[in-house]
Amino acid sequence: MGPAEVRRSMATRTRFWLGLLALASLTHCAGNPTALTHDAALAPGEGVVLLRVVGNASEPWSQLELAPDTGGTPQTVFAADFAENSSGVFVGKLPAGRYRPVQMKAALQTGNLVTTLEVPLEARLGRFAVEAGRVTNLGTVVYQEYGAMVKMHIKNAVVRSPAPAPSAALLHSQFPAVAAAVEGKPELGWDDPVRAPSPQLVQVLRDGRGQVRGLNGASLAQGGAVWAGARLGALLVRESVRAPWRRIDTGALHEIMAVAPLPQDRILAGGEEGLVVLSQDRGRSWTRLSVVAPERIVVFVGGTASGAVVLVAQGADDLQVWMASDPRSAWRQIGQIATARDRREGVVPGTPAGDDVVRWRTLQHPDFVALTDARLVIYSDERKLSTFDFASQRWDSVETPFVAHHTLAMPDGHLFAMPPVGASMFGSSDWGHSWQKLDYFTFASAPAFASDTTGYLAARPYGTTEIWRMMKTTDGAKTWNEQSELAFMPRKVIVDPASHALLALSVQGETFLSGDDGKSWQAAN
């Protein structure tokens, strides 16, 4: 993507999200007979259906059409606002009867237009029954795209998996009246249930993990390796900034949102639906840990200087913070912090059943949690900065004089914060109790530092065009100088402290490498 394409892409982002918002609003304003509501029980003759979809879709799925075998108009079931990022769980109520999936729909940007991608499901998945007062759990479907989009069509595979959808957790957290009505009743499923992975599923998972999307929570570990989470339970690691990506499979289907390498060849990772997994042999085998409820997304994991481990789990309106002396030992909750909704850059509108007001997926920006040698740092509810002191085991919370979009905490405790649009960068050396104004940008990524004084960030300096620049500081972030114009839209910058080699991750999921102080860039796998 060249500079002209970057300008066009940025200019159309607002139109894209407004189009999605309008699409979601229309579906709910018309009223949806399949929608479940928080306090309403099922009507006589109604049952519940759930289906989870995972994989490498271009956009999140928003609608699932189910046709009754007796004919008539297909029923539309919407994706729930549950603990998912790229995955989706469809849930709704249907009159008792027999049904088959007809198609899935997703809103898709094509040039300057927002259109609907439709994937036919007829004869690809099977049939199922809905009975009054019971749940039909259709489990998990894996979706994989092949090749490029041509005239709103793309070659794809849709395959059933034996993994169940999270019915109990979803119903209890969002629809308690329905959960009480179906409690203790055996769940239904497909007419021909999937009891083991089919050869087609194995192949689709191999294809999907081979071109897996997502570079979540990318960070530089001690020793110089770069780690990131991805879809379909995959981790990505570069043994150095200059090395290629290598994939590690955890065996899960959830998207991995956070990963932390630990001493003694251990790896801790977390993601959708409360997933927490541990490897003690550098990724060759994995054990799932029970730490947080499945209605939360694990958005951060890390190891402290003392050898303890910390994780942060995002809920609908709060964060839970957990800590353990060892991942295999008992975890204890050390904090619960209210959060602001709708802060994520490039937020994706969800269409939770039963809501006439469009809500949004609630993951915060991935740079809002950081570990230092002395404290855990969390920026959460608008102007609130919270730090947990490992020595005293106490929280300290302060109100910031700005709304931050990125936050960064250095190992020595120095903090940096970047407001979302057109404001100064700020720095603090007293855990957020006082702040100093630094340089001024229209937009910027979180900075990456090679030393106390030398750092890099991708930014649009104030007063410039929409082209992003790579910037460098040699005075501890007080002033920044341009190194180069970027032909891609950056999301995160990582620097190797030893060589000053730079790795940049783009919004489109691409990876770029610079070995000359950010002056030139090459695509890197």
Residue ranges and their predicted role:
Residues 29-75, 106-209, 512:
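Primarily secretory-pathway and cell-envelope proteins
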Residues 86-98, 105-107:
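Short Pro-Gly-centered beta-turn/loop motif in secreted/extracellular proteins
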Residues 205-233:
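Beta-strand-rich domains and repeat architectures in extracellular enzymes and scaffolds
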Residues 207-210, 249-252, 290-293, 336, ...:
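Surface loop/turn motifs at the tips and blade-to-blade linkers of beta-strand repeat domains
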Residues 213-217, 255-259, 296-302, 341-348, ...:
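Repeated scaffold domains used in trafficking and secretory/extracellular systems
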Residues 220-223, 262-264, 304-306, 371-373, ...:
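Residue-level detector of Asp-centered blade-edge/turn motifs that repeat once per structural unit
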Residues 232-247, 277-292, 322-333, 338, ...:
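Asp-box/BNR beta-propeller loop motif
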Residues 317-322, 382-386, 422-426, 465-469, ...:
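Structural motif
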